[in-house]
Amino acid sequence: MIRSRTLVLSLAFLLAACAASPSRVPAFVAKPYEPFVRANAIAIATREWRLFGSLIDEASLEGWEAASPLEKPERLPGLWQRVGEYWWLGQNPDEAAGAWTGKHGAGGTVFPFTDDERYAWSAAFISYVMRIAGAGDRFPYSPNHATYVNAAAAGRSSILRAEPPESYAPKLGDLICRGRYRAADLTFRDLPTSYTWPGHCAVVVSDTPGTLDVIGGNVEDAVRLTHVPVTERGTLGNPGEPVLDQRYRWFVVLRVLYDAEAEPARDE
């Protein structure tokens, strides 16, 4: 009788433990301790950029292909694990890609370095920045940029608004986005789409007359900063004309509705 009761209690304990499995994210972001502020998103993106060596997205890298895994920052010691943290912390618990790293796919299998496009982590990076900055459950975390671009364009996000690149000047902490490959010709008028498409988004971290500095993940296999030309009005382009950037066709700005510009002036 005692054994049966002990077994029942043990099973009940195990079931309760499974039901209350720990969240992927730290407590301070699961239920944000501080407001979701612009300054934190910029600081987090900048911190990650410095971790990867403060690399700049140079025009000379266009079309460059690594000859070995050692030429890919995402696969280097200390950095492949960091990419794994972008996946793990940036994705929701039901997303299988949350178990990936900079060189591992499902189950911890190392994928060929020539096949890393299937494991593109730029959206995981943006999701990570937004989550750690304190967006809570308001950001549409996803392994695909199209998810939150479409959510913003369709009015399905409480903290994102899709803005035309020729009329809205991106602010610090906003996201600028472009299509890639088959989606390279997407325009603002195409949004929202009924399908997922390959793309790239980056966080605006600095602005000077004529230039925005943006930080994005998985840019030539690293976190890199890109200099983006803007008009005198601060927009990516002028009405009826292509965007000024001749390298990348940025076609939408995601205005992020932060709770505040910076944390409250208290530290007690």
PLM features: residue spans?
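Surface-exposed intrinsically disordered loops and tails
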Residues: 73-74, 95-107, 156-158, 187, ...
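Low-complexity, Gly/Ser/Thr/Pro-rich intrinsically disordered linker/tail segments
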Residues: 221-268
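N-terminal capping segments
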Residues: 22-135, 265-268
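...with weaker cross-activation on analogous glycine-rich loops/strands in unrelated enzymes
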Residues: 138-220
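Bacterial N-terminal signal peptides that target proteins for export
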Residues: 1-8
